[in-house]
Every structure is written in structure tokens, then in C-alpha cells.
Amino acid sequence: MMKCLFLLCLCLLPIVVFSSTFTSQNLIDLPSESPLPKPVLDTNGKELNPNSSYRIISIGRGALGGDVYLGKSPNSDGPCPDGVFRYNSDVGPSGTFVRFIPLSGGIFEDQLLNIQFNIATVKLCVSYTIWKVGNLNAYFRTMLLETGGTIGQADSSYFKIVKLSNFGYNLLYCPITPPFLCPFCRDDNFCAKVGVVIQNGKRRLALVNENPLDVLFQEV
């Protein structure tokens, strides 16, 4: 009887050793879950809706405030308003309505999207509602925001919304192009911040290296 038990132990020993070796050296690494994207919120704490319209308003007040609006670019001979501006103060006209067009699904932080002025317009000017970034402006030594973009066009019409550490959001321009085509896209994700420059007394949205425009989104 003892001899049989001894032989049985000898037979089971390789299995135990193999099992121990497999357990210690061949652990299966399960993929870690990616963090869920955070939705962009409006001034009431509601998630932005692609089917709704919003005003882009500045966090600042008085001369530091002012809504974003569609206006005529100085010296432009185009048939339609084609510039993206910000009013000089939060006291005065309200901004032009916009809607956000994500690549798919909802509107989330740090996700590519298009921005469109959501206004009634004549057929001739329909294409002058989509935001884009223009060519390098020699006078300002930067690239100005204008309209005439194309939904889904990566080179000039893609933007992102990113959350500030304390309150509000920044807008980023994020093309999918070689770096030399966007010398201002310097962060790790190849994006540039949107701020303002003064053009003929108006605040024109443009790409900036510092002092980006801090904004909120107000549903209308």
C-alpha cells in the first residue's frame, strides 16, 4: 500500500511543478480600461448636444468679456461675412449661435469636431458658416480664424474643446497635417490654442502661443 502511494506521488510531482511554474511565469495581463471621455458642459451643467445651438461667451466681464460672432473680415471682397470675432465687451450684442459637430456620438473634451455658425443664410453663403483656420497672415504672423471650412476636413477645420484646470474651456485648432503647415501647433497633440488679435479695432480669433481665450457655452 505504501509503495502505491509513493508511486502516485511521483506521478503527480511533475504536474504540481508545471502548474507552479505556469502560475508564476505566465500570468495573463488583462487589458486595462481606458478612462471614459468627459462630456463638455454648458453654463447650466448640461452636456453639449450636437442638435442644440450655443453662444460662445468669455469668462471675463466688461472689457475682458464679449461673445464670439460672425463678421465681415476687413478688406475682404468675399460675398458673405467670413471672419470669426469676439465683441469688445460683454455689454452689448449677443454672439452668433454656433453648433458643434463631432466626428461621432456626443461632444467630449479633447475630441475632434467642427464648429458651425448656426444661422439662417442665403444659399450663396451656406459654405461660409463652417469655421476654419486661414493661411499664415504676414502682418500678424499668425493664422486667423475664418469661415468657409468643410465638415470632416482635417487640414483646416478640426478643433477641440479642452477643460481648464479651474473653470471654463479653451478652444484648440488640431489639424492632421505635417508640422511645417502649422508652426503654432506645438503641444504634444499637435494643436494650437485659439486666442485673439486686434484687427482694425476688432478682436479677431487667431492662433496664439499664450493668453488663449477662456470660454463657456450658453445654450440658446
From Swiss-Prot:
A GO cellular-component term linked to this record: vacuole
Gene3D superfamilies in the record: 2.80.10.50
Family: Belongs to the protease inhibitor I3 (leguminous Kunitz-type inhibitor) family.
InterPro entries on file: Kunitz_inhibitor_STI-like_sf, Prot_inh_Kunz-lg
Residues of the site described as Reactive bond for chymotrypsin: 144-145
S-S bonds: 80-125, 174-185
GO MF term (any one): serine-type endopeptidase inhibitor activity
Residues annotated as signal peptide: 1-23
Glycosylated position list: 51
Function: Inhibitor of cathepsin D (aspartic protease). May also inhibit trypsin and chymotrypsin (serine proteases). Protects the plant by inhibiting proteases of invading organisms.
Keyword Glycoprotein: yes
One Pfam family from the record: Kunitz_legume
Tissue: Tubers.
Main location: other
Site annotation Reactive bond for trypsin: residues: 99-100
Name under which the protein is recorded: Aspartic protease inhibitor 2
SMART domains membership: STI
Motif Vacuolar targeting signal boundaries: 26-31
Organism lineage: Eukaryota, Viridiplantae, Streptophyta, Embryophyta, Tracheophyta
Subcellular locations according to the entry: Vacuole
Species: Solanum tuberosum
Residue stretch(es) of the prosequence: 24-32
Stated induction or repression of this protein's expression: Not induced by abscisic acid, jasmonic acid and wounding.
The entry's keywords: Aspartic protease inhibitor, Disulfide bond, Glycoprotein, Protease inhibitor, Serine protease inhibitor, Signal, Vacuole
